[in-house]
Amino acid sequence: MRFQPLFWVFFIFAMSLLFITEEKSVNFPRRRKLYRHNCFRRRCISLHSRVPFP
């Protein structure tokens, strides 16, 4: 019965990968705040100069 130890090795490896990816997701930069016209910059008028403003 060589299957059971192999299964446990795979199971522990998979759980450690899940644990590592969960920790990394916390360190991602938070979502940047969107200003007017869904733009990341505060003054984005020059980028949207051809779009009529409401």
Curated annotation (Swiss-Prot):
| One CC-aspect GO term | extracellular region
- What's an example of a GO molecular-function annotation for this chain? apelin receptor binding
The alphabetized UniProt keywords are: Angiogenesis, Developmental protein, Differentiation, Gastrulation, Hormone, Secreted, Signal
Q: What is its main location?
A: secreted
User: What InterPro entries does UniProt report for this protein, alphabetically?
Assistant: ELA (IPR047853)
Q: Where does the UniProt annotation locate this protein? A: Secreted; Secreted, Extracellular space
Q: Name one Pfam family in it.
A: Toddler
Say which domain of life the source belongs to: Eukaryota
- Has keyword Secreted? yes
Q: Which residues does UniProt assign to the signal peptide?
A: 1-25
The record's section on CDD domains has: Toddler
A Gene Ontology annotation in the biological process aspect, one of them, is: regulation of blood pressure
Q: What does this protein do?
A: Peptide hormone that functions as endogenous ligand for the G-protein-coupled apelin receptor (APLNR/APJ), that plays a role in the regulation of normal cardiovascular function and fluid homeostasis. Functions as a balanced agonist activating both G(i) protein pathway and beta-arrestin pathway of APLNR. Downstream G proteins activation, apelin can inhibit cAMP production and activate key intracellular effectors such as ERKs. On the other hand, APLNR activation induces beta-arrestin recruitment to the membrane leading to desensitization and internalization of the receptor.
Kindly state the subunit structure of this protein: Interacts with APLNR.
Similarity comment: Belongs to the Elabela/Toddler family.
Q: What is the protein named?
A: Apelin receptor early endogenous ligand
Per the UniProt record, the source organism is: Rattus norvegicus
Gene giving rise to this polypeptide? Apela
